[in-house]
Regions:
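Short catalytic/signature loops enriched in Gly
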Residues: 2-5, 23-37, 50-56, 61, ...
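Conserved ABC ATPase "signature" region
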Residues: 40, 111-112, 163-180, 289-290
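The feature captures the beta-strand-to-loop junction immediately N-terminal to the Walker
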Residues: 81-82
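Helix-to-loop junction immediately C-terminal to a conserved catalytic motif
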Residues: 96
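Conserved ABC transporter NBD signature motif
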Residues: 104-112, 124
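Conserved ABC ATPase signature
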Residues: 185-189, 193
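P-loop NTP-binding/switch modules centered on Walker-like glycine-rich loops
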Residues: 208-211, 215-219, 223-301
Length: 424
């Protein structure tokens, strides 16, 4: 279901005292031209220290985000997917500066905002907003909807044309809510309506970048499509740039232009939507895609190869050496255990951090691995490997049997000896 554009959405927005002539809520009032880099992240890290003892000395760290690089262009939507605990939400809070990074750089419109203080970030809060995951805890239950949605105007000392109340009612109508509900409280709304209120609050100051952290995960399936379509409509109408964090691959496919796949604090693949879903190159991405249910019984029976990953996700406190996915990867070799693969563009618009990528026939750069040799090995060696494995298993089984038999004979002799000495 697509949410129709509201008539109020086309009205000229409010102006601010600080910047006359800037429209709040007007269409396409962005400084960055479409296609220009709006957000650039380089080597971003966030390590949460682990402290123990009376003196609270640091004994380790949780490597939630451990060196990621990506760019977001004006007007596009970047989707970020991965398992729970991979660092998606932490990354979202880092680029909105709700968390202080451990290392790395965050640039917004070419300006380094990595270490700006509260005062330095205040003007940028108008341009960078966040939609939080839980609509039940992100709204203050003691405040009315008018107070919640109007808070950004008061915090930024912005006076909309016609007053705050009129602008808040316009925003409520834009997100598909009744403007007359201005004086109601959050508990009087459903989960989907509360998320719409959160979206209205994020759009209040006409931001350039909106980071949406699992915007539909807490909602019923029947409501998810409405909220997703609303975000899409608002992007078309207002020229917004999104970073959408989610674990639902269907949602990400519907709204994203490019998709980043995260695993254990790292981006393992970054590609255009069509390329990623048609031919994923990282084994982890391929495993994620195989878990997406296919609603067509005929296609489901024809494409029923579900990849079940072995083991659990390693702890971010002590991640594996080399490629972090090698402990669960069916293609892992020695180079995967010792050398961390860089995120390289192996196809136009498709970057992957893997020594043995999927759906890739050409030779990879020499600093990773010779993929032509890996491909030949994959086609020619399996029988020999299986035979060698079988021989090894048989030899090991024979050795264990001999040791067991010798141990049993020794135990029997000891029992006989004890029995004889007891008779004497």
């Amino acid at each position: 279901m697509s949410i129709p554009a509201q008539a109020d959405g086309a009205e000229p927005g409010a102006t601010t005292g600080a910047t006359a002539g800037e429209a709040v809520g007007a269409t396409l009032t962005k400084d960055a031209a479409p296609g220009e880099i709006l957000l650039k992240v380089t080597g971003l890290q966030k390590h949460f220290p682990i402290r123990k003892g009376l003196l609270q000395r640091q004994t380790g760290a949780v490597r939630a985000v451990d060196g990621i690089d990506f760019e977001v262009r004006a007007g596009e939507t970047l989707g970020v997917v991965g398992e729970s605990g991979c660092g998606k939400s932490t990354m979202g809070r880092l680029i909105t500066r709700l968390l202080e990074p451990t290392a790395g750089k965050v640039e917004f419109e070419g300006k380094d905002i990595t270490h700006l203080g509260v005062g330095g970030m205040r003007p940028l809060r108008r341009d960078v907003q966040m939609i939080f995951q839980d609509p039940y805890s992100s709204l203050n239950p003691r405040h009315t909807i008018g107070t919640i949605v109007g808070a950004p105007f008061r915090l930024q000392k912005v006076t909309p044309e016609g007053g705050i109340k009129k602008e808040v009612q316009r925003l409520l109508s834009v997100v598909g809510l009744n403007p007359e509900h201005y004086n109601r409280y959050p508990h009087e709304f459903s989960g989907g309506q509360r998320q719409r209120i959160g979206i209205a609050r994020a759009l209040a100051l006409n931001p350039k970048l909106v980071v949406a952290d699992e915007p539909v995960s807490a909602l019923d399936v029947s409501i998810q499509a409405q909220v997703v379509n609303l975000l899409d409509d608002l992007q078309q109408e207002l020229g917004l740039t999104y970073v959408i964090i989610a674990h639902d691959l269907s949602v990400v496919r519907h709204v994203s232009d490019r998709i980043a796949v995260m695993y254990l604090g790292k981006i393992v693949e970054l590609a255009d939507r069509e390329a990623l879903y048609k031919a994923p190159m990282h084994p982890y991405t391929k495993a994620l895609m195989s878990a997406v249910p296919i609603p067509d019984p005929k296609r489901r029976s024809a494409k029923s190869e579900r990849i079940l990953l072995r083991g659990d996700v390693p702890s971010p406190i002590s991640p594996p050496s080399g490629c972090r996915f090698h402990t669960r990867c069916w293609k892992a070799t020695e180079i995967c255990r010792t050398t961390e693969p860089p995120l390289l563009e192996l196809k136009p618009g498709q970057r992957v951090a893997c020594h043995h990528p999927e759906n890739f026939e050409d030779q990879a750069p020499q600093d990773t691995v010779l993929l032509s040799a890996a491909k030949d090995a994959g086609e020619l060696v399996p029988d020999a490997v299986l035979a060698e494995s079988a021989e090894t298993s048989e030899a090991l089984a024979a050795e264990v049997a001999e040791q067991t038999e010798a141990a049993e004979e020794g135990a029997e002799a000891e029992r006989v000896e004890k029995s004889d000495s007891g008779d004497k």
